[in-house]
């Protein structure tokens, strides 16, 4: 059986609800295969909770108004669709909102049952006047994707029960791109970069884990056709090495010239650990990054007892290296 190098998955947290995941190295072509599958699954198949119907006291249907309430019922329903929920129950549950007197009614005024959490309590629902009074009964269900109000409508529903569009998906945006990456002498491997933004109901990490679990279950159906069939086997995980804390230092702390710094940032090199993973030739391949920049980087790294990939640590004599692949500042 062919054995492929085990890819590594790293997460860069951009904010609590957005992360960038990098998976590399992948066999040529697998970047798009994996990226497209994850994106579609994240957008359509991550389970979540949403309001499916409401009953508003004194309201027979959605095309009406309430005395003492600034918004009409249609506007209130639009606001209700923006409530972000989590629910531990597979069956429908009910929660209530009761508000009277002048002020703003928000999702934080709702009383949910145990096991149901409102992730955005500041969500505006309605504005009440002095004589305003608002009582709403919400039905909450779990599901996936998007379900229009028409599909939430029940034939035997009581009068005044108004179905609502349900946006179950806790994932807001997913994008990906595939770049080439080097493995030893080969440069045709894929690096998948996946950008995921979610609602407060779930973290990007948990959303990607859920999508991966779903895909494993589905692709497992194909494997069951013949469990003895050969495929590409992913190799073992590399043995973890002791992490040097200096590897996490941002390159800003190297005090490089603006030209060198901008070139490295544009290439996506943000830390010293990412920098020392490159060879001199890798850096020379960066646009506008020449030998003066190489010498500057090597000098800064040498002061920390570090060196570029495949470079010897500390001082060295370039004349002793075969092929002349390394140069000291005096060689120019």
From Swiss-Prot:
Intrachain disulfide bonds: none
Enzyme Commission no: 2.7.7.6
Pfam families, A to Z: RNA_pol_A_bac, RNA_pol_A_CTD, RNA_pol_L
Matches recorded under SMART domains: RPOLD (SM00662)
GO annotation, biological process: DNA-templated transcription
InterPro entries for this protein: DNA-dir_RNA_pol_insert, DNA-dir_RNA_pol_RpoA/D/Rpb3, DNA-dir_RpoA, RBP11-like, RNAP_asu_C, RNApol_insert_sf
Residue numbers spanned by region Alpha N-terminal domain (alpha-NTD): 1-226
Keywords: DNA-directed RNA polymerase, Nucleotidyltransferase, Transcription, Transferase
EC top class, as a word: transferase
One annotated Gene Ontology cellular component of this protein: cytoplasm
GO MF entry, a single one: DNA binding
Entry annotated with the keyword Plastid: no
Residue ranges of the region described as Alpha C-terminal domain (alpha-CTD): 245-332
Catalysis: reaction(s): RNA(n) + a ribonucleoside 5'-triphosphate = RNA(n+1) + diphosphate
Annotated domain remarks: The N-terminal domain is essential for RNAP assembly and basal transcription, whereas the C-terminal domain is involved in interaction with transcriptional regulators and with upstream promoter elements.
Biological function: DNA-dependent RNA polymerase catalyzes the transcription of DNA into RNA using the four ribonucleoside triphosphates as substrates.
Binding partners and assembly: Homodimer. The RNAP catalytic core consists of 2 alpha, 1 beta, 1 beta' and 1 omega subunit. When a sigma factor is associated with the core the holoenzyme is formed, which can initiate transcription.
Similarity comment: family membership: Belongs to the RNA polymerase alpha chain family.
Name of this protein: DNA-directed RNA polymerase subunit alpha
Species, as recorded: Bifidobacterium adolescentis (strain ATCC 15703 / DSM 20083 / NCTC 11814 / E194a)
Upper lineage: Bacteria, Bacillati, Actinomycetota, Actinomycetes, Bifidobacteriales
